[in-house]
Structure formats: structure tokens, C-alpha cells
């Protein structure tokens, strides 16, 4: 996927989803798992997502509002401190070629695993737009496992 404005995949389903063997070069988040439990109620939180064997190449090069990480997970809910809107997301065996360090940004998630067979490679292909230095940003989450990531830095 490339040349798509704003984001790549917008996911929302309680059924099992497997995202595998894709190429992402997107101006915003490559994968956005979002929900609206506040106004439109358009989709539910996810319950079982596997993201594997994908190449994420230099995402988030567009407008700063288009993405907060290669994989961004959140929800439009007012009570973020106690809600765990999305559950059971596994990221395994992917390659992240990034100029922006933000790989994953999560809030309101219960159950997330980033396995050690993911590879992170840094590029200088674009100027960094964010001041964020962390690869993994989590807020109001439970049961988050970030195994030792592989990196060339």
C-alpha cells in the first residue's frame, strides 16, 4: 500500500483479523485500529488481530495529524482511564524501516504483544516531524508485552 492519503488500513471488527505479507509506505499510520464509542458508534473494539510478515517503510511522512505511529490503536471514548476498548493484538515477524522512531502508539488496549522477531531499521529518508523518541507509546493499557526488538541502531 502506498500513495494513500492519511492512513493505510482502518480496522475495526470483533472477528479475527490477520494482516500479513503487505508493503506499507503511507503518509500517516500504516494501520489504524480505532473505534467510536462516543458519538457515531461506527465500529466496535477489536478482539483478535495478528499483524505479521509486513514491511512498514517510512510511514508518517505526511501531515503530523495523519498518524501517531506505524501502528496506532485507540478509541474515541471519554473514559480512557478505565476502558480497555481493544484486546489481543499481536505484532510478529515484521520489518519496520523508519525515520520516525514511533513504531506503536496504544491507548485503551488490553493484551498486546510485540515479539522479538520484529526488525527495526532506521533511515534518514525524511526529516523527523515528531519530537517523540520512544518506539512504543502506551497510555491506559494492560497486559502489554514488548519483547526485545531487533534494531540496526
Feature-to-residue mapping (PLM):
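Extracellular parallel beta-helix/beta-solenoid repeat domains
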Residues: 1-153
Amino acid at each position: 500500500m502506498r500513495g494513500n492519503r492519511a492512513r493505510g488500513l482502518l480496522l475495526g471488527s470483533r472477528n479475527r483479523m490477520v494482516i500479513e505479507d503487505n508493503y506499507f509506505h503511507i503518509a500517516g499510520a500504516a494501520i489504524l485500529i480505532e473505534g467510536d464509542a462516543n458519538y457515531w458508534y461506527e465500529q466496535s473494539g477489536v478482539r483478535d488481530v495478528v499483524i505479521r510478515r509486513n514491511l512498514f517503510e517510512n510511514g508518517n511522512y505526511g501531515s503530523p495529524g495523519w498518524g501517531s505511529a506505524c501502528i496506532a490503536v485507540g478509541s474515541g471514548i471519554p473514559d480512557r482511564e478505565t476502558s480497555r476498548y481493544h484486546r489481543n493484538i499481536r505484532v510478529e515477524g515484521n520489518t519496520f524501516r523508519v525515520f520516525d522512531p514511533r513504531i506503536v502508539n496504544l491507548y485503551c488496549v488490553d493484551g498486546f504483544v510485540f515479539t522479538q522477531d520484529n526488525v527495526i531499521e532506521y533511515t534518514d529518508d525524511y526529516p523527523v516531524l515528531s519530537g517523540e523518541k520512544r518506539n512504543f507509546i502506551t497510555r491506559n493499557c494492560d497486559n502489554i508485552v514488548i519483547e526485545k526488538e531487533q534494531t540496526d541502531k
